[in-house]
């Protein structure tokens, strides 16, 4: 059962059509016999700037607009969008005709394939590389059979010349773009070439030949713009369909019979997986004329009511017994009059046309039948334009010139029920990566985090929801399609199979390991200015603070002592930056021992176990390959005493790498699994906050992977991590976390259903200001799946297979 708020009443009956002449009479009214295909196309000139002279004194422009999330929005947000759309419609006065065009057409899949294309590199990774490439192609094929959905608004005005029309059209265009901006809708005006391409694609729906045109060719060849877009032929022999080139088509109009419609009606039509053009022609009626018309109808109804009452009296019946239609129409007319006079409503004349096209008559009839079925679902009918197929086809072109004389009178609210927004898509070019399929449209999601204001990201989900798997899939995609470096902090030892398979370096950090990383490592690009030691000092202070277990931080005297020692410790390296001159923790310890202050001795004593004692794993020169493109710091075996220290040192190593890569103009991706472990300690949490603040400027892209959003809201400082993340990949969420996310990201209850008891690999993607539900069912038979899975039984099977 439809919710009351999702439906808007329509007025019908005697107001349904202003006129509909006889079809055959209309066919005979053609003023001239078109001898060529070009003369059938109803415009005179198309300018480079997108201004089209449609008729002698009629000029038009077109704006393309994109989708926003309407169907998945909260009811409150839906109402806001609907009211803004009503205001949008009310902007148009009676001097402006406008046409909304919604075009579903088969796309050139080669353009999409270019975005997901992964070329073989003829190296040892080609087997998994091409396996991943094939998976992407299969996922692309699942999305809407290669259909592209585009949306346009075309507006036209009458003017004596293009000189007079141009400034007015540009002013209207600016207002339309601003009105779209209020709605949060991206839009841009089309130039002449883009407008011609739309018409070319409408005339050649079943052809693969691309549109080739330039205005320079017109000057060279003496041809007209119509020569470049026209099909080989038009045949309007039948009254119910037509032939254009190798395509057969039919145009129908929507006969609105329902007393009320839902805001889902247009979305249902646009969800069809067939070629379809929906055109809604709208003409505003002058307000005074509209009120005068309604008052005239009310007068006519009152006169008819009086006549019926007289008949009733003469026949001996109660004069209150009159035909029910009269009472209905009378009440309806008075309500419309009230809306026009006091509720900011206008009256519009609208024509809704549907252009179906196919290769064969059978396919066409099937498409028309499917379209008619959707209309019937909403208590409307889809009627063929008998003997007006040519007018219907030409009215479907985005020229804002309606040649079909069948119109329906609707108020603003009733017109706005054809909400042109459904759900957003995300398919970007550039270094875009695969994030699953849109759960609503089934279209592929390809997004480039580098294009976000803040590319920082979070992957959130309950255990078993697919967090680590999603992170590994992104890493794999990054490895195959970019030159970015990838660094992983792995507290659970889950990533090494994938890292080793991709030729990466796994660094096992533990008290018994022979892999060493030096916390004193520094490079000359460590800071923005020429003083790398200044920023390194912050890290050393955090390190010592953690070692000393100072809950309230170190005393100022202790910080001063360390700050005094650091230039002495690094002097040899800064004078001669050779690897063998890099200091180690023991050098800092020795320097502190030489200081006279008791604070220095206290710090040195705290450092002693990490320099000469059982925890001296971090008192060595780095002996592992840190210039590998893919590095995983496996800290699973670090004991409780070293775990926090190890995670802080790993973060500093990442910062070292980021600073080196910045000079090389290279991005660095940093993945932190079990991110909540870092947020529990003040020092590592503070360092993480700094990473989220500073990384973007240095070309770093950090991603935190954790279970609970609550950990990210533990303090105002840590909350900055959440606020500075424009990419959030949400898998299944616990109840408490769902409510927090809904509040923080303005997620609707319907959207929340995608992270409520959802299957593995399903959830919501927050990208900038866009929220898209996704699903990602990864083929378990692929070799890559065995490298990426975290399920113990599947890992065991993979190892057995590998050892066999």
PLM region spans:
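Hydrophobic anchor at the beta1->P-loop junction of P-loop NTPases
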Residues: 459
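Hydrophobic positions on the alpha1 helix immediately C-terminal to the Walker A/P-loop
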Residues: 470
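Extended, folded cores of ATP/NTP-driven motor/assembly subunits in large transport
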Residues: 2-421
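A short helix-turn-beta junction within AAA+ P-loop NTPase domains corresponding to the substrate/partner-engaging
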Residues: 503-507, 717-730
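Conserved lysine of the Walker
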Residues: 467
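Post-Walker A helix-loop "phosphate-sensing" segment adjacent to the P-loop in P-loop NTPases
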Residues: 477-487
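P-loop NTPase motor domains
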Residues: 68, 75-94, 101, 105, ...
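Conserved P-loop NTPase
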Residues: 745-801
């Amino acid at each position: 059962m439809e919710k009351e708020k999702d439906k808007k009443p329509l007025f019908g009956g005697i107001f349904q059509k202003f006129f509909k002449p006889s079809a055959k009479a209309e066919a005979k009214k053609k003023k001239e016999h078109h001898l060529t295909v070009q003369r059938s196309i109803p415009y005179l000139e198309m300018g480079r700037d997108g201004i089209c002279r449609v008729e002698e004194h009629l000029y038009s422009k077109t704006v393309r607009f994109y989708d926003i999330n309407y169907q998945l929005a909260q009811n409150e947000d839906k109402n806001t969008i609907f009211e803004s759309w009503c205001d949008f419609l009310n902007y148009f006065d009676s001097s402006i005709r406008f046409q909304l065009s919604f075009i579903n057409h088969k796309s050139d899949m080669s353009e999409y394939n270019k975005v997901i294309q992964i070329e073989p590199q003829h190296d040892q990774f080609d087997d998994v590389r091409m396996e991943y490439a094939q998976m992407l192609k299969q996922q692309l094929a699942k999305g809407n059979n290669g259909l592209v959905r585009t949306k346009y608004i075309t507006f036209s005005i009458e003017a004596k010349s293009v000189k007079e029309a141009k400034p007015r059209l540009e002013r209207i265009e600016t207002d339309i773009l601003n009105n779209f901006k209020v709605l949060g809708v991206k839009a841009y005006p089309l130039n002449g070439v883009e407008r011609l391409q739309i018409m070319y694609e409408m005339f050649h729906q079943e052809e693969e030949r691309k549109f080739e045109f330039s205005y320079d060719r017109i000057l060279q060849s003496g041809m007209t713009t119509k020569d470049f877009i026209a099909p080989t032929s038009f045949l309007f022999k039948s009254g119910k369909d037509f032939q254009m080139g190798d395509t057969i088509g039919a145009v129908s109009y929507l006969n609105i019979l329902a007393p009320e419609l839902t805001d889902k009606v247009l979305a249902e039509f646009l969800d069809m997986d067939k070629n379809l053009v929906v055109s809604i022609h709208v003409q505003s009626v002058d307000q005074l004329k509209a009120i005068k018309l309604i008052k005239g109808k009310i007068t006519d109804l009152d006169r008819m009511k009086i006549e019926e009452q007289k008949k009733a009296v003469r026949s001996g019946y109660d004069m209150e017994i009159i035909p029910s239609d009269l009472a209905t129409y009378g009440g309806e007319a008075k309500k419309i009059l009230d809306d026009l006079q006091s509720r900011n409503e206008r009256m519009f004349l609208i024509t809704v046309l549907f252009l179906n096209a196919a290769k064969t008559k059978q396919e066409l009839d099937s498409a028309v039948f499917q379209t008619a079925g959707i209309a019937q679902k909403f208590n409307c009918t889809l009627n063929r334009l008998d003997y007006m197929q040519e007018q219907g086809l030409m009215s479907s072109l985005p020229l804002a010139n309606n040649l079909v004389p069948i119109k329906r009178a609707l108020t603003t609210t009733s017109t706005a029920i054809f909400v042109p927004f459904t759900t957003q898509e995300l398919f970007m070019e550039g270094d875009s990566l695969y994030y699953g399929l849109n759960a609503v449209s089934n279209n592929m999601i390809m997004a480039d985090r580098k294009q976000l204001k803040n590319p920082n990201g979070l992957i959130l989900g309950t255990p078993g929801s697919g967090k680590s798997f999603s992170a590994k899939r992104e890493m794999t995609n990054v490895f195959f399609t970019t030159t970015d470096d990838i660094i992983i902090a792995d507290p659970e030892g889950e990533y090494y199979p994938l890292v080793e398979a991709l030729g990466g370096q796994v660094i096992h950090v533990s008290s018994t390991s022979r892999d060493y990383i030096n916390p004193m490592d520094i490079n000359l690009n460590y800071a923005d200015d020429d003083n790398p030691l200044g920023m390194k000092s912050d890290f050393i202070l955090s390190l010592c603070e953690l070692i000393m277990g100072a809950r309230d931080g170190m005393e100022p005297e202790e910080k001063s002592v360390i700050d005094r020692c650091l230039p002495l410790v690094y002097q040899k390296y800064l004078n001669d930056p050779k690897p063998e001159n890099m200091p180690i923790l023991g050098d800092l310890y020795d320097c502190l021992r030489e200081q006279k202050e008791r604070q220095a001795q206290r710090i040195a004593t705290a450092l002693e176990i990490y320099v000469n004692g059982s925890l001296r794993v971090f008192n060595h020169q780095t002996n592992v390959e840190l210039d590998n493109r893919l590095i995983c710091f496996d800290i699973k075996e670090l004991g409780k005493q070293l775990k926090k220290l190890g995670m802080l040192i790993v973060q500093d190593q990442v910062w070292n790498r980021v600073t080196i890569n910045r000079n090389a103009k290279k991005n660095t991706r940093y993945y932190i699994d079990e991110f909540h472990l870092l947020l529990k300690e003040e020092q590592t949490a503070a360092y993480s906050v700094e990473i989220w603040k500073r990384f973007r400027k240095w070309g770093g892209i950090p991603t935190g992977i954790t279970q609970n959003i609550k950990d990210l809201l533990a303090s105002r400082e840590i909350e900055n991590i959440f606020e500075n993340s424009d990419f959030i990949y949400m898998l299944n969420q616990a109840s408490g976390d769902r409510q927090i996310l809904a509040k923080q990201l303005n997620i609707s209850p319907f959207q929340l259903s995608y992270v409520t008891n959802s299957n593995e690999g399903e959830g919501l993607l927050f990208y900038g200001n866009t929220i898209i539900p996704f699903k990602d069912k990864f083929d378990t038979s692929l070799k890559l799946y065995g490298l990426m899975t975290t399920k113990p039984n599947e890992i065991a099977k993979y190892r057995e297979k590998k050892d066999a």
